[in-house]
From Swiss-Prot:
One of its GO terms (molecular function) is DNA binding. Residues 122-169 are annotated as: Sigma-70 factor domain-4. Disruption phenotype: Cells lacking tcsR grow normally but display reduced toxin production. SUPFAM superfamilies: Sigma3 and sigma4 domains of RNA polymerase sigma factors. NCBIfam families: sigma70-ECF. It holds the Pfam family Sigma70_r4. Sigma factors are initiation factors that promote the attachment of RNA polymerase to specific initiation sites and are then released. Transcriptional regulator specifically required to activate expression of the toxin gene locus, composed of tcsL and tcdE/utxA. This is RNA polymerase sigma factor TcsR. One of its GO terms (biological process) is DNA-templated transcription initiation.
Length: 170
């Protein structure tokens, strides 16, 4: 294994082929992250990230004169990017699943999109607040109808409704 510091320095000086040597050094790590992810394009995402990482690498810092610090920096950066991409992929998968469920219920696309946006907006509310807002805005029920359905007073429904709207406003 050649000196990683020198390889990065040469790459920054214009020796483009050095990036391939650097990628080869970290190929086992990229393969490990690929195996540990259910996202098919994880290796290519991390490879592209690594290009950007090497382009912006702070070689002028004294601590990066030794390979062990460079390797640790690249490893931690790749690991953080791996976590970020995995979380994003899981969120997309979750939305795809929700969309599939809603699609089965014969909703048109505009309704589907507004439902997904609505669910994203109310995600931080309590379950009771979410339930009441869904009944009011998605199902078109009045507060009195909701109160009869939930066996609570209309004032309690109104209070929960206003509290939820206030939370969303802030």
């Amino acid at each position: 294994m050649s000196n990683l510091y020198e390889s990065i320095r040469k790459y920054k000086c214009g020796y483009i082929e050095e990036i391939l040597n650097i990628l080869d050094m970290f190929d086992p790590l990229l393969n490990k992250f690929q195996r540990n992810s259910c996202y098919e394009d994880m290796k290519s995402e991390l490879s592209l990230f690594m290009f950007n990482l090497i382009d912006n690498f702070p070689l002028e810092k004294d601590c990066f004169k030794e390979d062990k610090f460079i390797i640790n920096y690249i490893y931690k950066s790749l690991k953080n990017k791996f976590i970020q991409v995995n979380k994003l992929h899981q969120k997309v998968k979750s939305y795809e699943t929700n969309i599939d469920i809603i699609w089965v219920n014969n909703c048109d696309y505009a309704n589907l999109l507004s439902t997904v946006i609505f669910e994203d907006i109310i995600k931080d509310l309590t379950q009771n607040e979410k339930n009441i807002l869904r009944k009011i805005y998605l199902h078109g029920l009045r507060e009195s109808e909701i109160s009869r359905e939930l066996n609570i007073s209309r004032q309690a429904v109104n209070k929960t409704h206003l509290r939820a709207l206030e939370k969303l406003k802030n």
